[in-house]
Amino acid sequence: MAAPALRLCHIAFHVPAGQPLARNLQRLFGFQPLASREVDGWRQLALRSGDAVFLVNEGAGSGEPLYGLDPRHAVPSATNLCFDVADAGAATRELAALGCSVPVPPVRVRDAQGAATYAVVSSPAGILSLTLLERAGYRGPFLPGFRPVSSAPGPGWVSRVDHLTLACTPGSSPTLLRWFHDCLGFCHLPLSPGEDPELGLEMTAGFGLGGLRLTALQAQPGSIVPTLVLAESLPGATTRQDQVEQFLARHKGPGLQHVGLYTPNIVEATEGVATAGGQFLAPPGAYYQQPGKERQIRAAGHEPHLLARQGILLDGDKGKFLLQVFTKSLFTEDTFFLELIQRQGATGFGQGNIRALWQSVQEQSARSQEA
């Protein structure tokens, strides 16, 4: 591995001026302003909930936004993952030697609280770039060059980023897996026993409906980096596009489809987001009527009617449970969305929940196409 990722610093978004992403993250999801910067046509605002940090780059300028790269993309998007590394300069040289494109070579930024060095590397996942950040000893609340923003404590619905899911073009997952392994030290994380890394977890949606391939990757032991999930469509759909294909079409290529945000109390968080005006995908109508589902929900210590009312999915086995709920898209282009996830001992991703998400997004997509 050339540049092992040690920690996820933040996820960056690029949106046009006036797009409400930053406002909605605060109003609907309980994120609080952390630091800001306005210069050269850019308004950069970092927002935080627990250890989860989103950097919203709004507008456009003649230069590049600090700690990132302007993708000049046609639609709003999550465009950058920023990782802490031990030595940004050395990491950049090693990645360049592997053939990686480095559109922003190492830059050192300093303010009264200390200094940081960063470089930006292109990835094979469409417009998604990766920032390699070295900030040991920096004392400020975010990064050099940003002005701290005072804010009241948030509701604490989200404590950290649990996983990141990339929507990929068909057949590209093995290439992406090797790239993240060779460049950042990620390794294959099986989602099912005996899983072939080249094939991942394959799930069919039924005759004429295609299916989904998921490949999970985890960073090296001891790092504080979310799981990375690669999602691609399987051939076989003969009717409408599935949600991965729709993402690729509407996003104009592969990219970050959703971020899973860990919550210590998914019932409370979902209720709070819904009360604030956030919208969630409705699970398939028969989800809560599956044989044994009510018993499983009660075994996890929850009330079936509460989960059903809020659209929370639950999967588990041998006393370990996984609860998930998915928002509608945060962009009018119907691309990027968020997931709230609570783990009660479970470390993977419930296949039952994955199938239910697939079906619920398909149903939502069908309604959108018919509207």
From Swiss-Prot:
Catalyses which reaction(s): 3-(4-hydroxyphenyl)pyruvate + O2 = (S)-4-hydroxymandelate + CO2
PROSITE patterns: VOC
Cofactor note: Binds 1 Fe cation per subunit.
All residue ranges annotated as the VOC domain in the record: 7-135, 160-328
Record EC number: 1.13.11.46
Substitution effect: L234P: In NEDSWMA; uncertain significance
Family: Belongs to the 4HPPD family.
Name used for this protein in its record: 4-hydroxyphenylpyruvate dioxygenase-like protein
Origin species: Homo sapiens
